[in-house]
């Protein structure tokens, strides 16, 4: 009975799956069958021997295959970027976080050098690194085998050497097979041509500078043998190289053979030879693929001594050939044309727009590189020479608003840098914000380009903010971008200081100077002078003057350090002036008076305003001796203000007869020097 009851509760489905339906009832002997397929109805009583009708089919959903790092991606999406943290590529250690572009490059090279050394050890001793501890599997962490395992002369040995990218060994094995009378298959010969054309009949660059000694020695011997020949050739594609020799020896050639040769010649700048091979392909009534046509278009655009009309007609002829051979263009086809039109400057603008319309007409979505080439055509580097710049960038940004992109072209990473440079030239902050919003949409941030392009982008963006944005917003961007996103150049700090000056927020100048020191801009003369000028230009409340004096003392120490390291170092006149003024206003009178000695030592002439400041300080302290020293300094430099300073000493200070006589002598000496200088000037006339 129990078995029959269980069997009755089994329900069959069309999908082939049999599910055991569980029941719950009030008693053990009288289970109640619950049917959930009709909402709002009572449970149907169990009737033995009768079929259950009206049961809805259950569709089992298909199993979804998740990415192996889906959990990590989900966790990463819940965390925002920390603006106070160092870039992830560097070690989170105070001594290993770079403070300048030079240190950043050095640290990255050191890190890459360590990775390369580790990989060299793993590949040199693979038997010690057989355990795979990574989950999921990471192929690059496991040893790679570079040495061929097949020793005999066979086509399999040739295929192995091709797979290992052994250019010279592959050519030697091919020659041995021909000498033995063995016919190499067309597929293997084409693979050998792929290898030779890709590397230009040269050995691939060594992954490790301290590896493959024999390979380097062979390269040196080859360089000595071909030294005279290489001087006569303009490009790296050598005439009658192994690729051309093997191509000529092939008893049978197919379209792949010709296409490989064409792409290899274009890659290594043998444009005329590539066009000749294409003519041979047409004579043999073969068709090229889209990648070969892309290479041919590139060859047409790089041929010298041709006018725009000739180049454009040649490109149109190639497009007609594609139609005749039923080859559908791809994104790279149009991007190659647009990149070639950049060499035509303003003449290429109308054809570029025609190309863009044609792309959209046949359903090819433009990439960031497409718009990069168009912006490059319409906005030259010097926009100041153009009275009415084009407005096409506004149309482009409106079209790209809110879209996400994936890398499809090598020039995709150049779009954001060029777009932000145009925003900077147009002085349009709203457009810059629009470009930055696009950068932060989805994963577009990954397409900002390599480190130099990324630095140019953020430098242009932040400089534009400093010039046109309110100071509170500027400071917010400053904290958000520096140093977590990019390391600022000293000109970035100068722009920020000028923004503080416009907003009358000079109390932040000492903090900006402190930050600039952290980024290795301590000895930048333009930055130091800008900081001192802003602090010394106007008078401020006493507590702020004290902070300015402390900052001036810090800057003075940098000049002293520079003077100690460079014996021939000469103090500039303006910093001496500014530091002395700041010391006087900040209550550091003794240090200010010592600055006068530096004027004499470095033969710099103080300004009249500085001498007046010293006289005011002497009057405030009631020191007649200090006032006379100021007059002596003016007299030593034969300054016209010396006489008025002497009169001020007599009027504002208590002067004894001896001091009064000294002042008179200084005045007479100063006047006689002035007369002699005027006489010499009249004699010269």
UniProtKB/Swiss-Prot annotation:
GO molecular-function terms, A-Z: ribosomal small subunit binding; rRNA binding
GO BP, sorted A to Z: mitochondrial translation; regulation of translation
Any Gene Ontology CC annotation: mitochondrial inner membrane
Keyword field: Acetylation, Mitochondrion, Repeat, Ribonucleoprotein, Ribosomal protein, RNA-binding, rRNA-binding, Transit peptide, Translation regulation
Location of the transit peptide in the chain: 1-10
The UniProt record lists the keyword DNA repair: no
Residues recorded as bearing N6-acetyllysine in the entry: 127
Compartment(s) where it occurs, according to its Swiss-Prot or TrEMBL record: Mitochondrion
A Pfam family matched in the record: PPR_3
Principal location class: mitochondrion
Compositionally skewed regions (Acidic residues) per UniProt: 676-685
Region ranges (Disordered): 663-685
Superkingdom per UniProt: Eukaryota
PPR-type repeats, residues: 150-184, 185-220, 254-288, 289-329, 330-366, 367-407, 412-446, 454-488, 489-523, 572-606
Function: Mitochondrial RNA-binding protein that has a role in mitochondrial translation.
Family: Belongs to the mitochondrion-specific ribosomal protein mS39 family.
Assembly mode: Component of the mitochondrial ribosome small subunit (28S) which comprises a 12S rRNA and about 30 distinct proteins. Associated with the 12S mitochondrial rRNA (12S mt-rRNA).
Protein name as it appears in the record: Small ribosomal subunit protein mS39
Gene: Ptcd3
């Amino acid at each position: 009975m129990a078995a029959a009851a269980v069997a009755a509760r089994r329900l069959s489905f069309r999908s082939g799956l049999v599910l055991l339906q569980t029941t719950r009832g009030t008693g053990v002997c009288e289970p109640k069958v619950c049917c959930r397929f009709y909402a709002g109805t009572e449970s149907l009583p169990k009737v033995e021997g009768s079929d259950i009708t009206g049961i809805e089919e259950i569709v089992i959903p298909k199993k979804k295959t998740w990415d192996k790092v889906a959990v990590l991606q989900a966790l990463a999406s819940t965390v925002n970027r920390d603006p106070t943290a160092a870039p992830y590529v560097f070690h989170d250690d105070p001594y290993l976080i770079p403070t300048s572009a030079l240190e950043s490059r050095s640290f990255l090279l050191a890190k890459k050098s360590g990775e390369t050394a580790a990989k060299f050890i793993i590949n040199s001793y693979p038997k010690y690194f057989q355990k795979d501890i990574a989950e999921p599997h990471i192929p690059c962490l496991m040893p790679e085998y570079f040495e061929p395992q097949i020793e005999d002369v066979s086509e399999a040995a040739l295929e192995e050497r091709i797979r290992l990218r052994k250019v010279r060994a592959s050519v030697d094995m091919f020659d041995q097979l021909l000498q033995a009378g063995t016919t190499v298959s067309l597929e293997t010969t084409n693979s050998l041509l792929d290898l030779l054309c890709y590397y230009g009949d040269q050995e691939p660059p060594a992954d490790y500078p301290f590896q493959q000694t024999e390979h380097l020695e062979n390269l040196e011997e080859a360089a000595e043998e071909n030294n005279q020949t290489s001087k006569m050739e303009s490009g790296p594609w050598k005439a009658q190289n192994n690729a051309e020799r093997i191509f000529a020896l092939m008893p049978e050639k197919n379209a792949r053979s010709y296409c490989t040769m064409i792409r290899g010649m274009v890659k290594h700048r043998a444009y005329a030879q590539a066009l000749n091979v294409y003519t041979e392909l047409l004579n043999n009534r073969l068709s090229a693929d889209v990648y070969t046509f892309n290479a041919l278009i590139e060859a047409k655009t790089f041929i010298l001594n041709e006018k725009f009309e000739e180049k454009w007609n040649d490109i149109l002829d190639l497009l007609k050939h594609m139609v005749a051979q039923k080859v559908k263009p791809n994104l790279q086809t149009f991007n190659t044309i647009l990149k070639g039109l950049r060499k035509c400057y303003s003449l290429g603008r109308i054809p570029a727009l025609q190309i863009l319309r044609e792309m959209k007409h046949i359903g090819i979505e433009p990439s960031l590189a497409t718009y990069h080439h168009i912006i490059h055509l319409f906005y030259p580097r010097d926009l100041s020479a153009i009275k009415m710049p084009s407005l096409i960038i506004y149309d482009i940004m409106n079209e790209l608003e809110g879209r996400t992109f994936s890398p499809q072209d090598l020039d995709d990473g150049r779009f954001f840098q060029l777009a932000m440079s145009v925003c900077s030239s147009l002085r349009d902050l709203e457009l810059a914000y629009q470009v930055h919003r696009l950068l932060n949409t989805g994963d577009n941030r990954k397409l900002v380009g390599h480190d130099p392009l990324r630095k140019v982008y953020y430098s242009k963006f932040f400089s534009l903010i400093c010039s046109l944005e309110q100071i509170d917003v500027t400071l917010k961007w400053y904290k958000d971008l520096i140093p977590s996103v990019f390391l600022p150049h000293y000109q970035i700090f100068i722009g920020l200081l000028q923004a503080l000056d416009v907003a009358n927020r000079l109390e932040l100048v000492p903090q900006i100077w402190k930050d600039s020191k952290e980024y290795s801009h301590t000895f930048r003369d333009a930055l130091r002078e800008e900081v001192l000028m802003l602090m010394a230009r106007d008078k401020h409340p006493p507590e702020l003057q004290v902070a300015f004096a402390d900052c001036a003392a810090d800057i003075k120490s940098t000049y002293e350090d520079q003077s100690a390291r460079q014996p021939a170092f000469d103090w500039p006149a303006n910093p001496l002036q500014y530091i002395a003024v700041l010391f006087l206003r900040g209550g550091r009178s003794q240090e200010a008076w010592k600055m006068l000695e530096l004027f004499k030592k470095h033969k710099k002439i103080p300004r009249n305003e500085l001498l007046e400041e010293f006289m005011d300080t002497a009057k405030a302290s009631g020191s007649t001796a200090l006032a006379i020293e100021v007059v002596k300094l003016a007299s030593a430099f034969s300054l016209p203000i010396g006489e008025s300073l002497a009169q001020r000493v007599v009027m504002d200070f208590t002067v004894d007869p001896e001091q009064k006589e000294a002042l008179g002598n200084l005045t007479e000496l100063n006047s006689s020097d002035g007369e002699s200088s005027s006489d010499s000037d009249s004699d010269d006339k």
